[in-house]
């Protein structure tokens, strides 16, 4: 299709492909024929420049002032605060009985009550009874005469102690003053059956019952909340309480651990002395420990045996490496003192004794290190084998055993199996006599249950359990 055909069709119909009158340009050819050029691309360069100069200026769009004002952010109108009435308003004080009265206006036909007379008048129309609605005097006076507008009414609370009892803080709505008096000063007569919450205003109760139980917000402590903001407020206090409880518990645990270590270290310092103790040889009840350089022995008595009514205490020997020496307080690193009272109790009161030594002057001694021998009527006996390991024997055959199962590993009798006495080497009885001239001294390693001194590893012979952190933090 030629451009001339397109132009003739548009002239006949009066249409424009671009929808605007100024979109197409009329160009007159050399033969007088009019042509409509849809775009400057169809013209030669000289003609395109001339056509551009002939174009009218583009119209300038001007926004109306109303549209400009509509798009600008409008300042939100603030609601008047409750209790700040118009100074020109009429102040009305109703009695508490009038505020709490319900259904004051009753229909004489069906005995249905209404809170306002206007509602009763509208109800009377259904019974074909005469009814009359009260009109404001302003509506009547506006038609007849130019009377002034009526004053606005505000209501004060009848409770003298209430903040809204002051006319300057009166409420401007009759329904509002009624609900205020019921909520703040009235009886809460409506109770929720789900949560037990009570309300003084029936509409408040209905709104609560509608949503109660539909949404639950549970705290980690188990308390349920129906509102998220209540949960967030509670969680702030709950988390703070949990952190405080955890901090106090950690402090209590640290204090208990320090107290146990201090008590044990006090027993160590009391055992370090340079006095020799006479040995009481008892082949059935011996407590012997040995090491290359013997440490102070841990005898964790809660009280001394003289104060403890149970003379059959289970003695635990704990191991302290050189790395733990800084735990000893300066008060426990004092010059050695006299033997403690419970050594005398073991030696003379229970038919046994304790012998400790730092070095044996006797060349016949087979123990390379310090030796401690404890003997009693019922005690735990240790023995050093020829291979360099320590064995344990508890009590005599036929007597009550002292190796109680405090950790609960033996569910049958509550006690740990004993080692036979004949498993101990025969030269243990001579060890005590060989070490009578030994002195008390500090050491670096003590045996617990059974220790292999050649490899440095612990061996638990029989069914003796390892001591957990309740007894000592070193095991």
UniProtKB/Swiss-Prot annotation:
Record-listed Zn(2+) 1 binding positions: 192, 195, 208, 212
Residue ranges of coiled coil: none
Record's GO cellular component terms: nucleus
Gene Ontology MF: a single term: zinc ion binding
InterPro entries assigned: C2CH-3rd_BIRD-IDD (IPR055187), C2CH-4th_BIRD-IDD (IPR055185), C2H2-2nd_BIRD-IDD (IPR055186), IDD1-16 (IPR031140), Znf_C2H2_sf (IPR036236), Znf_C2H2_type (IPR013087)
Motif (Nuclear localization signal 2): 177-184
Keywords attached to this entry: Activator, Metal-binding, Nucleus, Repeat, Transcription, Transcription regulation, Zinc, Zinc-finger
Residues involved in Zn(2+) 2 binding: 219, 221, 234, 238
Region (Disordered): 1-26
Motif (Nuclear localization signal 1): 123-130
UniProt induction comment: Induced by FKF1. Down-regulated by DLF1. During the basic vegetative growth phase (BVP, photoperiod-insensitive phase), suppressed via phytochrome-mediated light signals involving the phytochromobilin synthase HY2.
Keyword match Plastid: no
Biological process per Gene Ontology, one example term: regulation of timing of transition from vegetative to reproductive phase
Tissue specificity remark: Mostly expressed in developing leaves (more in sheaths than in blades, especially in the outer epidermal cell of immature leaves and in the region immediately beneath the meristem where internodes are visible) and panicles, and, at very low levels, around the shoot apex and in roots.
Span of zinc fingers (CCHC-type): 217-240
Region: SHR-binding, residue numbers: 227-239
Top-level taxon of the source organism: Eukaryota
Ranges annotated as biased composition (Polar residues): 1-16
ZnF endpoints (C2H2-type): 105-127, 155-185, 190-213
Phenotype caused by lack of the gene: Never-flowering phenotype in the rid1 mutant. Extremely delayed flowering under both short- (SD) and long-day (LD) conditions, associated with reduced EHD1, HD3A and RFT1 levels, but increased leaves and nodes production. Levels of FTL1 and FTL4 are slightly reduced under both LD and SD, expression of FTL5 is down-regulated under LD, whereas FTL6 is down-regulated only under SD. In contrast, the accumulation of FTL11 is slightly higher under both SD and LD. Reduced levels of MADS1, MADS14 and MADS15, downstream genes of EHD1.
Places the protein is found: Nucleus
Keyword Repeat carried by entry: yes
Role: Transcription activator that acts as a flowering master switch in both long and short days, independently of the circadian clock. Promotes flowering upstream of HD1 by up-regulating FTL1, FTL4, FTL5, FTL6, EHD1, HD3A and RFT1. Seems to repress FTL11 expression. May recognize the consensus motif 5'-TTTGTCGTAAT-3' in target gene promoters.
Protein name: Protein EARLY HEADING DATE 2
Organism: Oryza sativa subsp. japonica (Rice)
Name of the gene encoding the protein in the UniProt record: EHD2
